[in-house]
C-alpha cells in the first residue's frame, strides 16, 4: 500500500506517480530520506556522466541503465509508469506481471532502493559540482 501525505501539498509541484512510488520504496528499504539521493554524486538525480564516485553513485548509474533497458520494451516510459508493489519493511515485492513494463520499472526501483540502503553514504559527494567531478 502506498500512503502519501497531502499536508503542505500546495507547495509541492505535481510529480509523476512513479517518482512518488520510488520515494516510498527508498523509505521502505532503508532509513535515509529520498532527498539525500537527489543531488548525490555523478548519477543520482537527473542525468549522469563520467565515473561513479562510490558504491552509492554506482547504484544510481545502474538504476539509470535499468530504466534505459525498460524503455526498449514497447511504449515503456519509466518515469511515468505506475506499478504495484508491497512493502514489509525492509522487504519490497513487485507484484505486476513478469515481463510487463510496470514490473520492469518496479524491479529497477526495487533494486535501486535495496542498493541505496546497503551502500555507505559519503556526505562529501552530496551537491558536488558535476562539471568538475564527473568527467
UniProtKB/Swiss-Prot annotation:
GO biological process: one example: fatty acid biosynthetic process
Gene3D superfamilies attached to this UniProt entry: Phospholipase A2 domain
GO molecular function: calcium ion binding; calcium-dependent phospholipase A2 activity; phospholipid binding; signaling receptor binding; toxin activity
Catalysed reaction, written as an equation: a 1,2-diacyl-sn-glycero-3-phosphocholine + H2O = a 1-acyl-sn-glycero-3-phosphocholine + a fatty acid + H(+)
Cofactor note: Binds 1 Ca(2+) ion.
Organism: Bungarus fasciatus
Main localization, broad class: secreted
Expressing tissues: Expressed by the venom gland.
Alphabetical UniProt keywords: Calcium, Disulfide bond, Hydrolase, Lipid degradation, Lipid metabolism, Metal-binding, Neurotoxin, Presynaptic neurotoxin, Secreted, Signal, Toxin
Function: Snake venom phospholipase A2 (PLA2) that inhibits neuromuscular transmission by blocking acetylcholine release from the nerve termini. PLA2 catalyzes the calcium-dependent hydrolysis of the 2-acyl groups in 3-sn-phosphoglycerides.
Entry annotation: catalytic residues: 63, 109
Family per similarity comment: Belongs to the phospholipase A2 family. Group I subfamily. D49 sub-subfamily.
Essential cofactor(s): Ca(2+)
EC number(s) from the headed UniProt entry: 3.1.1.4
Protein name (record): Basic phospholipase A2 KBf-VA
One GO location term (cellular component): extracellular region
